[in-house]
Amino acid sequence: MYIQSRVRLLLPILSFLWIATACTDEAVHVQKELYFPLRSYLQQEIVQLEKHPQSVHKTMILDGKKEVRTIKEIDWEKEWALFIDSDLNKPAFDKSYDNLSEEGFRWYSLKIGEKLPVKKMKIQLDALERPASIEIEMSQTNFLFETKKKLHMNFVDGKIETYSIEGWQKMRWGSPTQYQLLGVLLTK
């Protein structure tokens, strides 16, 4: 009799708990973005450029040899891959950067002792908190090579106007290769 009364008391409690947990939405683990959401911002820009294509006046310099072209169709994901991959909002990076930001300016600097390719990221924001300019410094060194890159993007009204990548790479047993790329989005 004692056990039966305990079961009768326990059954409604267990039923209530089961219903309460069954009716809640599954917890979605969304990582809070600690840094400026560069990847998602650029992907939004790419979507807009795919809807409203723009030509690009592109200047490329490789070891002093210059080439200038106007390109009408461009794969923006590939073109801006270095910028997109520079996004700092990755779970492994959450404690790797000092946040030196102030109002209207985002500045992230790699902490001493960390070994990640993005060393600094500076983002100047306009009055509406959209990027006005982005500057990224990257470098990597290993047994075979050393590489340094500076990436820049300039914006007008939150839309990309120009972008540039300049850098050099030196293989351990070779001479350094220097390169520059400047892209200017042309209005129709």
Please report, for each region that a protein language model flagged, where it lies by residue.
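Bacterial N-terminal signal peptides that target proteins for export
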Residues: 2-11
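Poly-acidic low-complexity segments
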Residues: 5-6, 37, 75
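Alpha-helical transmembrane segments
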Residues: 14-17
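C-terminal motif of bacterial Sec signal peptides marking the signal peptidase cleavage site
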Residues: 19-22
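Bacterial signal peptide processing site
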Residues: 24-27
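Post-signal peptide N-terminal segment of mature Sec-exported envelope proteins
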Residues: 31-54
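Surface-exposed acidic loop/strand-edge motifs in secreted or periplasmic proteins
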Residues: 46-128
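Gly/Pro-enriched, hydrophobic low-complexity segments
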Residues: 106-188
